[in-house]
């Protein structure tokens, strides 16, 4: 069937098989047959013609023959088999392949192979205007083997964050991240009024009721997760983080990123935050810091790009080394904006020129802050981009 033609992206097993066949110049041609040709399947079928002894004129070439219309209807279908190729149909395909010639789209009527139209039922309501079908054609094209290859580039864009320690962000820290967030919020709503200061998060006398709610509303949770959810340590840790966030908010005061003013420069905010944490006398471990930052930040396409690190090398904006505020830096990548581009292969042009010219003409005009991820390289030729 047709899946071997396109199944699997660049670098996958299927793609590597196709790549080997084409690079070893083993493929002479592919013939597209009509649908409904076989008993058990009605899907499109393709014949691959392989040879390790190509004629000189076929070297580096692949012939594609469109024979999808070369068939007639059977009087009685056999399962999914409804179409049948006649001797003249088969002869046309074999002769076209044998002659290794290009045939522009030609109607079957011109070729003397027009089939008898299938009789439509006259029962029921008929449309006011008859539907005109496009004439059925036959064609053959010849391509270079390299025309079927491409280099898959990974295109990155910078993470842009706004930050503000709002009351809402602080309140959200009472609950752990997924998968605990929604269950904790639901249990807090149900049982918080019954907890005292020294019994906060204690489910020892409420476990049966809590489990009933979890089973009814959060059936996807595993037993281990339920045990963690009903452990007071989790609740106390989250409350402690929330209280730390309140202290940090107070220390930030009226500065950008505090309660009253949003910061659209996360790089500057990190410096401000570091000072506020020190002044508040609190400490955040790595896990707490991540949850805190996630709670107070939102993606904003108009914010400054987030700097990942300062580089000592020269600027190469096409590959992610940007001049920014007097330094050469690498930005954090925004995974949600990551994209891929398939660049057609061209053996007459070096790989670097090929991908750079493509990037500058097809990508930069649309997203001027993008760059090519140079870490994504082909395993065979070690060039940027994965060949497919």
Q: Which residues fall in each region the model found?
A:
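A conserved structural/catalytic subdomain of Rossmann-like adenosyl-cofactor enzymes
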Residues: 2-388
């Amino acid at each position: 069937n047709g899946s071997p033609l396109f199944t699997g992206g660049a670098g996958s097993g299927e793609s590597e098989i196709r790549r080997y066949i084409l690079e070893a110049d083993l493929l002479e041609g592919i013939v597209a047959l009509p649908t409904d040709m076989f008993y058990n399947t009605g899907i499109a079928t393709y014949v691959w013609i392989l040879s390790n002894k190509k004629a000189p004129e076929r070297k580096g070439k692949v012939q594609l023959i469109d024979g999808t219309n070369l068939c007639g209807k059977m009087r009685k279908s056999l399962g999914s088999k409804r179409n049948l190729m006649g001797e003249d149909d088969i002869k046309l395909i074999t002769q076209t392949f044998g002659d290794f010639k290009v045939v522009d789209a030609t109607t079957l009527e011109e070729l003397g192979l027009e089939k008898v139209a299938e009789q439509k039922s006259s029962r029921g309501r008929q449309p006011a205007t008859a539907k005109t079908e496009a004439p059925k054609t036959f064609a053959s094209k010849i391509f270079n083997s390299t025309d079927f290859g491409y280099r898959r580039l990974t295109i990155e864009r910078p993470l842009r964050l706004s930050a503000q320690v709002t009351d809402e962000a602080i309140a959200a820290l009472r609950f752990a991240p997924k998968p605990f967030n929604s269950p904790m919020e639901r249990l807090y709503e149900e049982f918080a009024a019954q907890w005292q200061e020294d019994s906060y998060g204690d489910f020892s006398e409420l476990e049966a009721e809590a489990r009933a709610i979890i089973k009814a509303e959060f059936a996807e949770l595993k037993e281990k997760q339920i045990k963690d959810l009903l452990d007071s340590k989790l609740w106390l840790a989250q409350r402690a983080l929330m209280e730390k966030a309140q202290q940090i908010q107070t220390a930030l005061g009226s500065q950008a990123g505090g309660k009253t003013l949003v910061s659209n420069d996360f790089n500057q905010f990190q410096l401000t935050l570091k000072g506020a944490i020190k002044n508040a006398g609190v400490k955040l471990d790595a896990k707490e810091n991540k949850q805190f930052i996630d709670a107070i930040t939102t993606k904003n396409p108009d914010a400054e790009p987030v700097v990942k690190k300062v580089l000592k090398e020269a600027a190469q904006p096409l590959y992610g080394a940007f001049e920014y505020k007097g330094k050469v830096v690498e930005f954090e990548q925004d995974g949600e904006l990551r994209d891929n581009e398939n660049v057609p292969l061209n053996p007459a042009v070096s790989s670097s020129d090929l991908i750079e010219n493509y990037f500058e003409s097809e990508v930069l005009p649309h997203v001027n802050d993008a760059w090519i991820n140079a870490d994504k390289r082909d395993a065979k030729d070690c060039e940027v981009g994965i060949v497919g």
